[in-house]
Amino acid sequence: MRTLYVHIGTPKTATTSIQMFCVENQKVLNKQSYSYPLLDFVYPHVAHRRNGHFLVGWVYKPGGQEDVEKEQELWEKGLAMIHQEFEKYDNVILSDENIWHSSNGRKFPFWAKLMQDAKEHDYQVKVIVYILSLIHI
């Protein structure tokens, strides 16, 4: 079954290194039927390698108000990207450190929306999370 891997980076667990590895090794991943797609749109102050940011990203209007319509537009573009990648690869990997932070906040409903999309488009979702042992802090 096609699988969407969602890497939710907890603090100090090498999320940036994992993202950079995936970007730099795209050809190797592709040969194994994995894709780490880069979005064709960007969020201000968010590194391009954070391809899962559309799941929880905030967008603001020039006056500082949240732009819910734009957030929905980017959500739909991000899902369309996943669907396109599944036409070529069996596995798609997304990663963003804000997913961890947003899982307890106002953006939490994205999980239900993502699971609904997975059901409608016949893929499964697996979450990857690394936890840093407190003894190392």
Predicted regions mapped to residue ranges:
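PAPS-dependent sulfotransferase catalytic core
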Residues: 1-100
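Short, surface-exposed linear patches
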Residues: 28-30, 114-119
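Well-ordered, non-membrane alpha-helical segments in soluble/globular domains
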Residues: 71-80, 105-117
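Secondary-structure boundary elements
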Residues: 87-88, 116-124
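Extended amphipathic ligand-handling, pore-lining, and cofactor/metal-binding catalytic surfaces
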Residues: 126-129
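Active-site glycine-centered loops adjacent to acidic/histidine catalytic or metal-binding residues
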Residues: 133
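Conserved small/polar residues in nucleotide/adenosyl-binding loops
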Residues: 136-137
